[in-house]
Amino acid sequence: MNYKTEDIADGKEVFISGSFTFRDHDTFFEIISLLKTGSCKKLIFNLSGCDFIDSAGLGMFVIAHDEAESKSIELVIKGAQGKVRDVMLATRFDSLYTFEN
């Protein structure tokens, strides 16, 4: 997994590309640290470049949700496609995150 961040009006957009698996947990926790800054009110995970996610990757998104919920931060999944989108919807991530095309 690779990622880059961009500032948006009320938070950050994180562009995730490649495969997102258990071995990316240290990298993902760097991203979660963005939720701990007081100025972040919205965090968008742009998955348009993500081509695979395993169960550990899904679990990390649950951890991000729990952290964000405790701080009233809006979370968005943007651009998820193909099997990544299918597995996220099949596991009801649309009940945790707002999904955008």
What is each PLM-predicted segment?
Residues 1-2, 101:
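Absolute protein N-terminus
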Residues 2-30:
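STAS-typified acidic loop motif
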Residues 8-10, 48, 100:
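Conserved catalytic submotifs in the C-terminal HATPase_c
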Residues 17, 100-101:
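Short beta->alpha connector loops at strand-helix junctions that form conserved
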Residues 19-97:
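Amphipathic alpha-helical interaction surfaces in cytosolic regulatory modules
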